[in-house]
Structure formats: structure tokens, C-alpha cells
Amino acid sequence: MKMVGQMCVCAALVALAMAGNRLAMAEDAKPLYEMNFEQTEVGKVPEGFLVVDGAFEVKQEGDNKFLELPGAPLDSFGVLFGPAEKSGVSVSARIRSTNKGRRYPAFGVGLNGQSGYRLQVSPGKKALEIYKGDLVVSSTPYEWKSGEWTMFQFQIVKAGEVWKLAGKVWVQGATEPAQVMVSYDDKEEPSPGRASIWGNPFATTPIQFDDLTVRSVPEGKAQ
């Protein structure tokens, strides 16, 4: 019996270790915020959105509505939404754009307000990156597919004396990655802020955003 007990303990430890690099998304928890744009009038922006900059507006393609950032001017544009949170929160969305020749857009989701953290796909660098403000603090290689919806998940949780950022992306319809793709540990306490979406239309093509969701995540959860 003692041997069986030891085996059970070992199995539990192995399971915890395997879960160590997985996003602790609270998929079953009631969202803190959701927006699919279906109830928003075409040409408008949903009530409660704070447009940092950019001519964002709701567009419709068939039966689907989404928020679109036009392909000009060329700059960085964003929108803040949902409640202001410091940690224990995740943001998810799907984003689509196209390249034009050798010119590529860049886009992503963010947490902790306008100057907080950002999970960004940068096709021109073939990278998935985490930004803190305007500084890239973590990066991993990533091959983006032009014209496909890219699914984003990004979260921040406090674990001990650090705040852990973790993110992953995948093409809609493909299998969601089981593991975190890019992460960053910040020893500096962040400020509370709203979730966000961002776009840089460097390819002069529109960037489209849909299915924005903010959820709570248990603090101290292993990443």
C-alpha cells in the first residue's frame, strides 16, 4: 500500500509539472466582458470602447460583423475595452489581415491599459512577441498565415513576487496549442488597466478584429 501511495504522489507531481507551461485560462468561468459586434450598427464603434487612435468601425461580411481598422494611415492604433484589472485576467480575440508584397501588418491584444503589455504577431519579423510599453521583452519565431483569422490568448497572473505574462496564438480551425508559446516574468508591479486590441497596418491593408473576451484567471496558477 505504501508503494501504491508513493506512485500516486509521483503521478500527481508529474501531472503538475506537465501542466506547468500551459495557459491557465478560465474557460469555464463567466466572462468579465464579451463583444462579438453582432448588436453594433455597421459604421459605428460599440458603446464603452475607448479608441486610443485610428478610424475603427464595425463592418459586415456575410452574416458576420467585426471591427475593422483601415489600411491607412500607417501608424499604431488601438482600442481599450472591458474592466480595468491589474492581474488575474486574460484577454482573447481573433484577428485577420493580409500582406501586400513584402509589406506586412502587425497586430495583437493587450492588458493593463494603453502603456501595459501586448501580445503581438509581427509577420515582418516572423515573430510572436510580448511588449511592455514600447519595448519587446520576449519573442519566439512564428509563421503567420495571410488572410486567415488568428486566435489570440494572453494573460497576466501574480505568482509569488512576480507577475507572469503568457500568450499563444493559432490559426482558426487548427488545434489550439497545449503549451504557452511566449512568456515573460515581470518583477515590477503593473498598474491596473483595461484590455486592448492593436493594429499597425504597415501593408496598407485593413486589420479586422472579432470575438473579444476578458476572463478572470486564478492568481498564482502555474504557467
Feature names for model-found ranges:
Residues A26-V51, K221-Q223:
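Extracellular carbohydrate-recognition regions
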Residues F37, D210-V214:
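Extracellular beta-strand elements of beta-rich domains used
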Residues F37, V91-A93, E148-A159, W163-V169:
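Short tryptophan-centered beta-strand motifs in secreted/extracellular beta-sheet-rich domains
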Residues E41-E68, P73-D75:
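Extracellular glycan-recognition surfaces and repeat-rich motifs
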Residues G62-N64, E68-L135, P218:
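Secretory/extracellular carbohydrate-interaction modules
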Residues F77-P83, S138-W144, Y184-D185, W198-G199:
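Beta-strand-rich interaction surfaces with strong enrichment in secreted/lumenal proteins
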Residues Y131-Q153:
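Short, aromatic/His-centered strand-loop micro-motif at the edge of beta-sheets
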Residues E176-Q208:
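Flexible glycan-contacting loops in extracellular carbohydrate-active proteins
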